[in-house]
Amino acid sequence: MYYGFDMGGTKIELGVFDENLQRIWHKRVPTPREDYPQLLQILRDLTEEADTYCGVQGSVGIGIPGLPNADDGTVFTANVPSAMGQPLQADLSRLIQREVRIDNDANCFALSEAWDPEFRTYPTVLGLILGTGVGGGLIVNGSIVSGRNHITGEFGHFRLPVDALDILGADIPRVPCGCGHRGCIENYISGRGFEWMYSHFYQHTLPATDIIAHYAAGEPKAVAHVERFMDVLAVCLGNLLTMLDPHLVVVGGGLSNFEKIYQELPKRLPAHLLRVARLPRIEKARYGDSGGVRGAAFLHLAEK
């Protein structure tokens, strides 16, 4: 059995998956914001409850909104202050008497998609999240590529490419980013960036859902905005595809529901790839909100 915890700022969700990778049980509880011993106790209690339900000890994986530190075993997770800077993996492993694996929740999203029955046929899967920010994960032969600092999937912190400046104008503001730099692509091609770009060019603020509705109705400003956005998205993704060369790209996050992305990217991407490059398959994510739990559970699958 595979147990996956999705640990967020307000809730902890546990999903239990059987040997056929089907979810058979789940439970959700509030996240203790400040009390680390209480957090450990909740994770222990949920694990033992799952053991009782299954009649066996399952493997345990945890997805966090942050990064594990490979050097000292602590976690950096600002959204869960109770776990910030704590050796969560070692402490929980000791409590439940089994190995615990921890990874970034965006990596868990990518892993969940890569273990889809159909998507498993692709050796290299790029999970791309276009949500409040931009992130994701790279999966090779069913395993997460974490990198030295667990930041392989921090795609949103590439800077705007030169070709994007040709589209947006050389004087486009280099938007300050939460990472401390300016001009990171997540401030332009995320859901938030989609809205910012519209506001910048038209001095009018609208939520993404309204912009997309205006686009569907043929409103000229919205149409021009979507065309511009798709061009910038293709430029940025073209750089990413040239670097990583995946067989499959799976798109998640709020903007993944904008179906125009899957129509336009295959048309626009070739201009930004090497001539010998073949386009990867580009698909919408299949597991939605359950992807974090599912991917966390599957952190133990690569060894099979």
From Swiss-Prot:
<comment type="similarity">
    <text>Belongs to the ROK (NagC/XylR) family. NagK subfamily.</text>
</comment>
<keyword id="KW-0479">Metal-binding</keyword>
<keyword id="KW-0547">Nucleotide-binding</keyword>
<feature type="binding site">
    <location>
        <begin position="4"/>
        <end position="11"/>
    </location>
    <ligand>
        <name>ATP</name>
    </ligand>
</feature>
<dbReference type="GO" id="GO:0006044">
    <property type="term" value="P:N-acetylglucosamine metabolic process"/>
</dbReference>
<comment type="function">
    <text>Catalyzes the phosphorylation of N-acetyl-D-glucosamine (GlcNAc) derived from cell-wall degradation, yielding GlcNAc-6-P.</text>
</comment>
<dbReference type="InterPro" id="IPR049874">
    <property type="entry name" value="ROK_cs"/>
</dbReference>
<feature type="binding site">
    <location>
        <position position="184"/>
    </location>
    <ligand>
        <name>Zn(2+)</name>
    </ligand>
</feature>
<dbReference type="GO" id="GO:0009254">
    <property type="term" value="P:peptidoglycan turnover"/>
</dbReference>
<keyword id="KW-0862">Zinc</keyword>
<dbReference type="InterPro" id="IPR023505">
    <property type="entry name" value="N-acetyl-D-glucosamine_kinase"/>
</dbReference>
<keyword id="KW-0067">ATP-binding</keyword>
<keyword id="KW-0808">Transferase</keyword>
<dbReference type="GO" id="GO:0045127">
    <property type="term" value="F:N-acetylglucosamine kinase activity"/>
</dbReference>
<feature type="binding site">
    <location>
        <position position="157"/>
    </location>
    <ligand>
        <name>Zn(2+)</name>
    </ligand>
</feature>
<comment type="pathway">
    <text>Cell wall biogenesis; peptidoglycan recycling.</text>
</comment>
<dbReference type="InterPro" id="IPR043129">
    <property type="entry name" value="ATPase_NBD"/>
</dbReference>
<dbReference type="GO" id="GO:0005524">
    <property type="term" value="F:ATP binding"/>
</dbReference>
<dbReference type="InterPro" id="IPR000600">
    <property type="entry name" value="ROK"/>
</dbReference>
<keyword id="KW-0418">Kinase</keyword>
<dbReference type="GO" id="GO:0008270">
    <property type="term" value="F:zinc ion binding"/>
</dbReference>
<protein>
    <recommendedName>
        <fullName>N-acetyl-D-glucosamine kinase</fullName>
        <ecNumber>2.7.1.59</ecNumber>
    </recommendedName>
</protein>
<feature type="binding site">
    <location>
        <position position="179"/>
    </location>
    <ligand>
        <name>Zn(2+)</name>
    </ligand>
</feature>
<feature type="binding site">
    <location>
        <begin position="133"/>
        <end position="140"/>
    </location>
    <ligand>
        <name>ATP</name>
    </ligand>
</feature>
<dbReference type="Pfam" id="PF00480">
    <property type="entry name" value="ROK"/>
</dbReference>
<keyword id="KW-0119">Carbohydrate metabolism</keyword>
<feature type="binding site">
    <location>
        <position position="177"/>
    </location>
    <ligand>
        <name>Zn(2+)</name>
    </ligand>
</feature>
